[in-house]
Amino acid sequence: MLKEEDKIFTNLHGQQSHDLKSSKKRGDWENTKALLDKGRDFIVEEVKKSGLRGRGGAGFSTGMKWSFMPKNSEKPCYLVVNADESEPGTCKDRDILRFEPHKLIEGCLLASFAIGANNCYIYIRGEFYNEASNIQRALDEAYKEGLIGKNACDSGFDCNIYLHRGAGAYICGEETALLESLEGKKGMPRLKPPFPAGFGLYGCPTTINNVESIAVVPTILRRGASWFAGIGKPNNTGTKIFCISGHVNKPCNVEEAMGISLKELIEKYAGGVRGGWDNLKAIIPGGSSVPLLPKLLCEVEMDFDSLRTAGSGLGTGGIIVMDKSTDIIYAIARLSKFYMHESCGQCTPCREGTGWMWRVMMRLVKGNAKKSEIDELLNVTKEIEGHTICALGDAAAWPIQGLIRHFRSEIEARIKSYSVV
């Protein structure tokens, strides 16, 4: 369990103002110049030592990603913050943008300095109008105080931060599709290699990080890498914001230590499952893209490695709780429709496969199918998985795989009852 003094996001629920004056009282922008004076290498190494892994879903080492940037590039370098949070069940970045904007902006300055980028872009989801307004106000305050811009914090380093609003496409949450959109093109993922660190925004070296990944950096540098590494578990260090929704008594966002049990999270912070733990049917533990877990596995620890071992993933930390009243087949079919709608259409397996999977899923919802089609559907998900430019194909396949793995008997019973009728 996370101690109160170890929390990074002390205004996560917006009890206090998010303006500069209030943010400074909570510790933001405290002697930022001293952190910059320690140099680029110090910041990168400290973030590496902390064990911080990307909070957007992939879980790649943040410090390692920064170290891929060229030291003396002839081209300008860029930092891009992915605030295009569109994953169903996920709203952690939204609350950072709403209530902790200065944590993000200070993190942008420190990360930009670490990778040698004089320009940073915050790409925010188009629907986040109020959040974009909050960020812009915070940017205006920071510019006015000399915290960013020319000679940021009197450090001799110039850092301009720009806010760019997207247009509501889920695919633009994929880092290279985001870059395409930022350049004014259609948001479609790029083939990799080349990777963004070598050929990113406008063909220049670029690092793309999630909002939460950047927002925790100032606190890590102030308190030290060993402090952050001491929270959680080895290889799964630090704190994480979890979004708990669905059939719970008190849906909420909460910051907790990595490795906390899923059951403890739900019972301590969300008031427990509606109707009690025995009424639980399944949980999606990391946003809609990861396979669900049946009740039997729902006491798993919430970290990258434990959830992978359990056959799912931490993803974004978006916990969707489903009680026994849930039509589990229809719930996953609804996710299939989402991925069909959000596919950019660039890759044939995803373009054709997502629609095909949704149509089969809707027949399974009614029971109007043959039992052999369950295995046929499973085989198609495996043909899509790993055969697309980006991970949207995987994201569409995994929920169905989880459903068939854990609830095949329920699908078969639905088919049997339909044939009897």
Curated annotation (Swiss-Prot):
Enzyme Commission no: 7.1.1.-
Cofactor(s) in the UniProt record: FMN; [4Fe-4S] cluster
Binding site for FMN: 166-213
Keywords: 4Fe-4S, Flavoprotein, FMN, Iron, Iron-sulfur, Metal-binding, NAD, Quinone, Translocase
Origin superkingdom: Bacteria
GO terms of molecular function: 4 iron, 4 sulfur cluster binding; FMN binding; metal ion binding; NAD binding; NADH dehydrogenase (ubiquinone) activity; quinone binding
Region of interest (Disordered), ranges: 1-25
Cofactor remark from the record: Binds 1 FMN.
Annotated residues for binding of [4Fe-4S] cluster: 344, 347, 350, 390
Residues at which NAD(+) binds: 54-63
Amino acid composition bias (Basic and acidic residues), ranges on this chain: 16-25
Catalytically driven reaction(s): a quinone + NADH + 5 H(+)(in) = a quinol + NAD(+) + 4 H(+)(out)
Role this protein plays: NDH-1 shuttles electrons from NADH, via FMN and iron-sulfur (Fe-S) centers, to quinones in the respiratory chain. Couples the redox reaction to proton translocation (for every two electrons transferred, four hydrogen ions are translocated across the cytoplasmic membrane), and thus conserves the redox energy in a proton gradient.
Record family assignment: Belongs to the complex I 51 kDa subunit family.
Protein's name according to its UniProt entry: NADH-quinone oxidoreductase subunit F
